[in-house]
Amino acid sequence: MTKTIFISTKENTGSIQFQIVNFTKKICKLTNHLKLHKKDYLSQRGLRQMLGKRQRLLSYLSKINLTSYNDLILKLKIREAKKDLF
């Protein structure tokens, strides 16, 4: 998974897609760390926070641009966000 797929220019680092890719990369690193260090509770808390931030960004992207959202989910191989029940 590379960031260059989603970056058109160097100034585009604030885009939603780039932020989601960046969070996904950090989540993968932290998941591998937690496989070795199971009792690292501070890292577990950080992982939950990152998952929440990525989830909020994904739901925002799905409301703004559904085609970009679907492409991003397929390329990153992550599950689709749960839809609001209300």
From Swiss-Prot:
GO-annotated cellular components: plastid; ribonucleoprotein complex; ribosome
Keyword hit for Plastid: yes
Keywords assigned by UniProt, alphabetized: Plastid, Ribonucleoprotein, Ribosomal protein
SMART domains: Ribosomal_S15 (SM01387)
One of the Pfam families matching this protein, by short name: Ribosomal_S15
SUPFAM superfamilies: S15/NS1 RNA-binding domain
Gene3D superfamilies: S15/NS1, RNA-binding
Gene Ontology biological process terms from the UniProt entry: translation
Record localization: Plastid
CDD domains registered for this protein in UniProt: Ribosomal_S15p_S13e
Statement: the UniProt record of this protein carries the keyword Plastid: yes
InterPro entries: Ribosomal_uS15, Ribosomal_uS15_bac-type, uS15_NS1_RNA-bd_sf
Domain of life: Eukaryota
GO molecular function terms noted in the UniProt entry: structural constituent of ribosome
Record's subunit section: Part of the 30S ribosomal subunit.
Family from the record: Belongs to the universal ribosomal protein uS15 family.
Alphabetized PANTHER family for the sequence: RIBOSOMAL PROTEIN S15, BACTERIAL AND ORGANELLAR, SMALL RIBOSOMAL SUBUNIT PROTEIN US15M
The protein's name: Small ribosomal subunit protein uS15c
Organism per entry: Cuscuta obtusiflora (Peruvian dodder)
This protein's encoding gene: rps15
